[in-house]
Each structure stands twice: as C-alpha cells, then as structure tokens.
Design a protein with these regions (language model features):
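Conserved, mostly hydrophobic/aromatic
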Residues: 3, 45, 66, 102, ...
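Glycine-rich, aromatic-flanked loop segments that form ligand/cofactor-binding clefts
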Residues: 41, 103-139, 173, 185
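Metal-dependent enolase-superfamily TIM-barrel catalytic cores that perform enediolate-based chemistry
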Residues: 128-242, 424
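Shared catalytic-loop signature of beta/alpha-barrel
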Residues: 60, 219, 230-247, 252-359, ...
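Motif-centric detector for short Cys/His coordination patterns
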Residues: 1-37, 55-58, 67-74
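Metal- or metallocofactor-binding catalytic centers and their adjacent structured scaffolds
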Residues: 7, 41-113, 332-336, 401-423
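Short beta-strand elements
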Residues: 36-42, 352-355
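Flexible C-terminal active-site loop/helix
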Residues: 4-20, 29-30, 304-305, 309-424
Length: 424
C-alpha cells in the first residue's frame, strides 16, 4: 500500500451574526469556527483521515513540507516513517509539530488495512471507554452559566468546564450558583485560559491566590491556566499553596517544555492537544512520565468530533489512573445548550459518537472506527480571515485569533481599537 496524496482541506462555519461576549478586561467577538480535514489517499483506494489545525499556516506546512515526503512511500510502519521524517523535513520544529496530525491519518489507514482499531496499533486498549467533561461556558452572567451547566448535566455529562473571567467576585458567584444547580457529585473545572492576564485590567497574583483558595470551598476539580503558561515557576508556587488542583499544558511548544512542566511540580493535571502538539508518539512518552510522577492527564480537544475520537483511541490504551479525562466541546444546537453553533463539529462523522453516562464508548471498528462524511468539504467552504477578536479595554487594541494554536496568545496580531473592526 503506497501513499498517493496527502490533502489538507480547510473548512469554516460562519455564525449567522457575530457573537459578542463581555469579560473583565474587554470584549470578545466570535465570527466563525474553522477546522481542517486531512485526507491521505493510497493506491489501494483506502483513505485515512485526521483532524488538523484550522489555519492557512498549518495547511501550507502540510502541503509544502509533509506531503512531498510521504507521497510515493509504502505505508507499513508509521514509526519507521516518522524516524525518516524527523531525520529530514522534521528537523524543522514547525513541520515536526504538524506531522503528528497527519500521522493520525496514517494510523487510520493502517488500521483499516489490517482490520483493527487504531488503539491496537498504538499500545493496545486496556478499557473500552474514557471519561468526558462537557466543555462550554464562555463569558455569561452567573445565572446563565448555572443554566448551561444544568442543561449539560441533563445531556448525561457528569462534569462541566467553564471559561471564567467576568470579574473575581462574579466568578465566585458563578461557581456558587453552578454548584447549587448540579449538586455536590458533579465535577467542575474552571478554565482561566490565561486571559486573566490579558490587558492592564487583569487578575493580579494576589487575586488569583484568593480565587484559588475560595474555589476549594466548591470542590473544583481543577483550575486551568490561571497564569502565563510559560511561567512554570509561578505555577509551582501556586500549586504549593495547595488550594485546588492546577492544570496546564495546552500551550507547551514542545516535548522538552512538557517534561519541565511535569518534573517541576507545577501542576496536578497535564493537558495536551494531540492535533497540534506532537501526536500519538509524543503523548505516549509523556503518559509514561506523568504516571511515574503521580500526576494525571486530561486531553485538550477544542475542535470536531473527529478530534475527540482520535484522542480517545489513544486514551483507552492507558488506565484512568493516568489518562483520566477527555474534553468534549459542547456546541449549541436547536435542542441542546452550548457555547455557540458549530454543526460541522458533529457532521464530520457519519455516525454520532456514543456517550453513556458521561463516558465515550470507543468504537472497535477498523482505523478510527467511524466513517468520515466527506460532504462537509462542499457544505462548509473555507472563509479566510480570523475567526475571533479580543477587544481589550486597556491598552485599547484588538487582538485577532487565526486558530486556537497557530501562534502563542501573547503574539496575536494587534491593531488599534479605534480602527474599524475588520470583516472576516
């Protein structure tokens, strides 16, 4: 079986109207959501699929640096292909990072060819399900957060993650109301997403310490990224206060930084997105280190159901004592609560994911286990431009976001807030 083509398709879902969300230091506007579907086509007619970063930068890297390397090569051993790639084009750090997403499609192909699920190619499953947390909650009133948490619990989830940042006192009121709404046996995660430090009007260190201490009263499962993600020493100091478990990792640039995060005593939960942070091999090495360190792992997943599925195939190869959680983004539909509509996220799969009492039941079919619906390629054409903007009160500026992880949050494109807001 030889690889004929490697394709990266950018997709977009535009919101009917821009969604404006107000936080402590300004306003966020969401215009659309983007995604990437990777296709690897072989001479046997089999096609492998993978999720990718929804950015032109990622597409250009795949098409110029990864596709030429893979085209014409036999697909029998993805690990051997990786070694050759890292000795050649993969010496470029950005291409090495992007290769992890394409590699998921290679495993999907190999699983289909051999008639086994991807999990059997990357260690072997030790369980058939993985615990999910419903992830939504973005910049609302405390009452709206509580209403959404109740709705997500009604969908069968037993955990809810929210993005806080509407002001310290309002954040605490939000957690109080959510805990009242869902009861004591429901897990809550608070994601500060480093935005507590965006602009001049931010949460200073003393405020963050006080919030962490107050959150302990409500039995919060973790506090995520309350500080700049590259400051591991600051995380270690906060963790030493032992108020609430601390989580971080989705912005680590490479494996070396991950190892420092794990070994420095900075966090209780390590997070990683397999689409944009090294793929299966990197995650497997980190899982071993996390297990030795007595920490826990939680997948970051902020895209489509295909990304959730790809992560789950890996997660079930490790016990829940190491790989505990998988993020499940909850987008809104006419009948369900969520952040905003993003129908592409579910429609990329022909069959819905099976969720039972808050656990994803991981399919045993060949490859990733669920067929991709290629009609999304025509139904959701790419729309160039940023998908979101942060309008910061002080200093007055707008920061555009081109994809969740295409560039560090503190290096986003900036322009004067006094300028007219750009169109997508």
């Amino acid at each position: 079986m030889k690889i004929l083509r490697v394709e990266s398709h950018l997709l977009s879902y535009p919101l009917a109207e821009p969604l404006k969300l107000y936080y402590y230091g300004g306003e966020r506007t969401i215009l659309k959501r983007d995604a990437m579907l990777i296709r690897v086509v072989t001479d046997t007619g089999l096609v492998g699929y993978a999720p990718g970063e929804g950015s032109e930068k990622a597409k250009n890297g795949i098409e110029s640096g990864i596709a030429p390397f893979l085209q014409g090569r036999a697909l029998a051993d993805p690990d051997a292909l990786r070694v050759h790639f890292m000795e050649g084009p993969g010496r470029d750090a950005e291409l090495a990072r992007l290769y992890g997403a394409v590699e998921i499609a290679l495993y999907d192909l190999l699983g289909k060819a051999r008639g086994v699920p991807v999990s059997e190619l990357i260690g072997g499953r030790v369980r058939d399900h993985i615990r999910l947390y419903g992830s939504a909650g973005m910049y609302m009133s405390p009452e709206k957060y509580a209403e959404e948490a109740r709705a997500i619990a009604a969908l069968g989830f037993r955990a809810y993650k929210l993005r806080s940042g509407i002001g310290p006192e309002q954040d605490l009121e939000t957690i109080r109301l959510i805990r009242e709404a869902v009861g004591p046996d429901f897990d809550l995660m608070v994601d500060a997403h480093t935005w507590w430090r965006m602009g001049d009007r931010n949460y200073v260190a003393a405020t963050i310490d006080r919030l962490a201490e107050s959150l302990a009263e409500y039995n919060v499962a973790w506090l995520e990224e309350p500080l700049p993600p590259d400051d591991h020493e600051a995380y270690r100091r906060l963790k030493e206060l032992d108020h609430v478990p601390i989580a971080s990792g989705e912005h680590e640039p490479d494996e070396e930084h991950y190892l420092d995060l794990i070994r420095s005593g900075a966090v209780d939960y390590v997070q990683m997105d397999i689409v944009c942070q090294g793929g299966y091999p990197t995650a497997r090495r980190l899982f071993a280190e996390i297990g030795r360190g007595g920490l826990r792992f939680a997948f970051h997943s902020w895209g489509t159901a295909l990304e959730v599925l790809a992560a789950a195939q890996l997660g079930i190869c490790w016990p829940e004592s190491v790989v505990e959680w998988l993020e499940y983004p909850c987008y809104s539909t006419p009948s369900t609560a969520g952040m905003y509509p993003f129908p592409l996220a579910a429609e990329v799969l022909k069959t819905p994911l099976e969720i039972d009492h808050g656990y994803l039941m991981v399919p045993r079919g060949p490859g990733l286990g669920i067929d991709v619906d290629e009609t999304v390629l025509k139904r959701y054409p790419w729309i160039p431009g940023p998908w979101s903007f942060f309008q910061i009160d002080s200093p007055r500026e707008v920061r555009s976001v081109t994809s969740d992880h295409s560039q560090p949050w503190h290096e986003q494109v900036s322009q004067s807030r006094d300028q007219r807001e750009p169109n997508p």
